Amino acid sequence: MSEVNVINIKNPFVDQKPGTSGLRKSTLRFQEEHYLEIFIEAIFKSINNLRGSTLVVGGDGRYGNIEAIKKIIQICVAHKVGKVIIPKNGLLSTPATSHLIRKEGAIGGIILSASHNPGGIEGDFGVKLNTANGGPAAESITNQIFQCSQSLKSYKIRNVNIPDLDKLGIYSFGETSIEIIDGLKDYSDLMENIFDLDQISDFLKKDFSLIFDAMNAVTGPYAKNIFVEKMGLVDDCVMNGIPLEDFGGLHPDPNLTYASKLADLLLVKKAYSFGAACDGDGDRNMILGQGCFVNPSDSLAVITANTNCVPGYK
């Protein structure tokens, strides 16, 4: 295995100030030399006890996702992170990342997503840090990351042979192990523990129809795994279910404008009883009933009012 390389940079990138939703810039900006690496280095410098810890890394599948994960692996090896957990094909929704961080006792997770922003070479890219509690980094941490990014003169990286991310397995590089996992299993298992999927499936197979728009983003495989494989619903209950680097030209923002086909099916044609859509990384949704739009606050209120019906919340 090669030695750790210390790559020097001339000047900091003055626009690397993240919010709680991370750092979002154009894809082209993230592809500039050293831009991603310096920001990851700043994140690592802001994490206490990084060496020997567990880190989760994944993304929403937008353009540049795989390449970014490979660079992050090399930086993790240089920093002697103990274990890096990566989903197959690099696909991991934000809710699934949150669950995996807590389940594995990870120090945090790096999510490669610009959320509901468009993808592709002409679109946007993003990096956000979730901490050990599974939630987004607090402002105090993101401020520290920015301050660090402005003072860094170099970053560490180790050139290693990156395994194919489409194959499950465990690979060792010095003090670091790379574990490529089934990114769907843990989250679908969690859903089975929280909800009675059999009961919901029986209900949906009677006189209540469902359609879900994944907007060609990360939630498509989750929806097919849960709705089709586990609950036995028809395959076409999921539309735009294949993650694409540019989201198939769609803007993955689940609203009446960008999910207009779904809205037409529910609000105009009234072809289904229930419809929903999610954004790029799966942490934002839109819910529609037959002929009606459901405000996000109302959907949360409905769940809260009926927690006694949800096994995981009893």
Feature map (PLM): residue ranges:
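N-terminal glycine-rich anion-binding loop in soluble enzyme alpha/beta folds
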Residues: 3-48
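Gly/Ser/Thr-enriched, mixed-charge loops and adjacent short helices
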Residues: 4-12, 26, 34, 121-269
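Short, glycine-/Ser/Thr-/acidic-enriched flexible segments
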Residues: 23-25, 30, 62, 115-117, ...
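Phosphate/oxyanion-binding active-site loops and adjacent basic polyanion-contact surfaces
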Residues: 31-44, 64, 93, 179-190, ...
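Glycine-rich phosphate/diphosphate-binding loops that line cofactor/substrate pockets in enzymes
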Residues: 40-55, 197-206
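N-terminal small/polar loop signature for handling phosphorylated ligands or for N-terminal nucleophile
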Residues: 45, 56-123, 225-287
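Short glycine-rich phosphate-binding loop at a beta-alpha junction
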Residues: 52-60, 209-212, 314
